[in-house]
Amino acid sequence: MVSCENLWQQALAILATQLTKPAFDTWIKASVLISLGDGVATIQVENGFVLNHLQKSYGPLLMEVLTDLTGQEITVKLITDGLEPHSLIGQESSLPMETTPKNATALNGKYTFSRFVVGPTNRMAHAASLAVAESPGREFNPLFLCGGVGLGKTHLMQAIAHYRLEMYPNAKVYYVSTERFTNDLITAIRQDNMEDFRSYYRSADFLLIDDIQFIKGKEYTQEEFFHTFNSLHEAGKQVVVASDRAPQRIPGLQDRLISRFSMGLIADIQVPDLETRMAILQKKAEYDRIRLPKEVIEYIASHYTSNIRELEGALIRAIAYTSLSNVAMTVENIAPVLNPPVEKVAAAPETIITIVAQHYQLKVEELLSNSRRREVSLARQVGMYLMRQHTDLSLPRIGEAFGGKDHTTVMYSCDKITQLQQKDWETSQTLTSLSHRINIAGQAPES
C-alpha cells in the first residue's frame, strides 16, 4: 500500500501541471496529506485563510486527483495546524473517546525532529526530547517542557510521538491536550465508566500531555492525572508534559503534582535568537521549495521576534502577496504588506536620548547639537524616530527635547528613517535593537 507521503507527492506532481506556478506555490505546495482511510483524505494546510480558499477554488480538483490515484471515490477533509491534538494509537474501548485507529495518526506531519531547528534557546529541550524518544522511561521521566506560546513545545512533543511510532508502529503512544483528558474524564463520570477511562490512559506505553497549565483549579482532574502518572511511572512508561510555565508557577496546581513533575527534567524553551529565527525561515523555505533572498530572511527574522508562529505566519503572507501580485520577493515589496508588530514600552525622553547616544558613541551634547556631520545627523534622526515610537510627545515637543529643533525637522527625520528601515536591513536591525533596549529601560522599576 502506498504511504500517505508518497501518494501526496504523486498528487502534488499532477497538481503542479494543472495550476499556474503562483497558484500552486501559494495554495497547494505547503499542504500535507496526513491520513487516508474510509474514502476520506485529511489534508493539513497552513492556516484558515488557505483552507477557505482551497475549499472554494480547488476542492473538486483535489478530490479528482486523489480519486484517480487511489482508484476509489475520495472525499477531502481540510484542517489547519491549529487542529486540537487527539489520541493517536489505542485499543478499542467502550469509552466513547475520539480515538484514531491503529497506524493512523492525528499528528502534524511537519512536526518531526528533522524539521526542528536547534538553537541556543531550545538546545536542551531538543536533546532531552530526542533522548526520551530513543530510550523512554529511563533518565528523564517525566520530561517537562515549558516555554511561551509558539516556541516549539508542541513540535517537540509530536516529534517524539512520530519517532516512537516509526520505530514501533504498534506502540500505544497517546498524545492529548489537557482539555481532552478532562473532557474524557467528564464523559466517563457522566456515563459511569471510570474503569474504561483508567484502563485506557494507564495502558499507554508513552503518554504526552500538552498545555498542562489548564489543569489548574480542576481538583478531580488533578486527582485522576496524579494516579495515572503514578501508574505509568511505576511501570517504567514515559510521560512527557508541556506547559507555558514551570510547574512551580502554575497557580492552583497540587503540591504532589509539582513534586512529580519536578522529579524528572524540566527543560525550558526561550524565544529564539536572530540566527535561529533566520535558520527557521531558511529551513521552511527549503522544505517548501521556495527561494528566499537573504535580505528578506533577515528582514522578517529581525522584525518578528516573539515566537515562531508569528515568524512563519509573516513568511506565508510574504509568499502569498508576491505570488498573487506577481512581484519579486524583495524587502521593498513585502515590508508594507507585513507591517511587522513593534512592542513599545513608554520611556522617558532622556532615556531614549541616552541610549541612542551610547549606541552611536556620541556625547548627549553632540546628539542635541546642530552638527550636520553625517553620523550625528543620522543618530539624531534615529532618536527622533524612536521618541515618536515610544512616547506620546507631539512633534514640536520632540523637537524641543532634541535641542529646540523645528517640528518639520522631526517629521522629515521620522519619514526618512521609516523609509530607510524598509530598504536597509542594517538600519532595521539597529532600530529593533534600540527599541528592545528602550523597552527594557521602560520596564525597569524606579529607584
From Swiss-Prot:
Membrane spanning residue stretches: none
Stretches the record annotates as Domain I, interacts with DnaA modulators: 1-79
Region entry Domain II, spans: 79-105
Primary residence: cytoplasm
GO biological process annotation, one example: DNA replication
Pfam families recorded: Bac_DnaA, Bac_DnaA_C, DnaA_N
Positions of the UniProt region annotated as Domain III, AAA+ region: 106-322
Residues involved in ATP binding: G150, G152, K153, T154
Residue span of region Domain IV, binds dsDNA: 323-447
GO terms for cellular component: cytoplasm; plasma membrane
Gene Ontology molecular functions: ATP binding; ATP hydrolysis activity; DNA replication origin binding; lipid binding
InterPro entries cross-referenced by the UniProt entry: AAA+_ATPase (IPR003593), Chromosome_initiator_DnaA (IPR001957), Chromosome_initiator_DnaA-like (IPR020591), Chromosome_initiator_DnaA_CS (IPR018312), DnaA_C (IPR013159), DnaA_dom (IPR013317), DnaA_N_dom (IPR024633), DnaA_N_sf (IPR038454)
NCBIfam families in the record: DnaA
PANTHER family: CHROMOSOMAL REPLICATION INITIATOR PROTEIN DNAA
UniProt remark on domains: Domain I is involved in oligomerization and binding regulators, domain II is flexibile and of varying length in different bacteria, domain III forms the AAA+ region, while domain IV binds dsDNA.
Family affiliation: Belongs to the DnaA family.
Complex and partners: Oligomerizes as a right-handed, spiral filament on DNA at oriC.
Function comment: Plays an essential role in the initiation and regulation of chromosomal replication. ATP-DnaA binds to the origin of replication (oriC) to initiate formation of the DNA replication initiation complex once per cell cycle. Binds the DnaA box (a 9 base pair repeat at the origin) and separates the double-stranded (ds)DNA. Forms a right-handed helical filament on oriC DNA; dsDNA binds to the exterior of the filament while single-stranded (ss)DNA is stabiized in the filament's interior. Isolated domain IV (residues 348-447) binds both E.coli and B.subtilis oriC.
Protein name: Chromosomal replication initiator protein DnaA
Organism placement in taxonomy: Bacteria, Bacillati, Cyanobacteriota, Cyanophyceae, Synechococcales
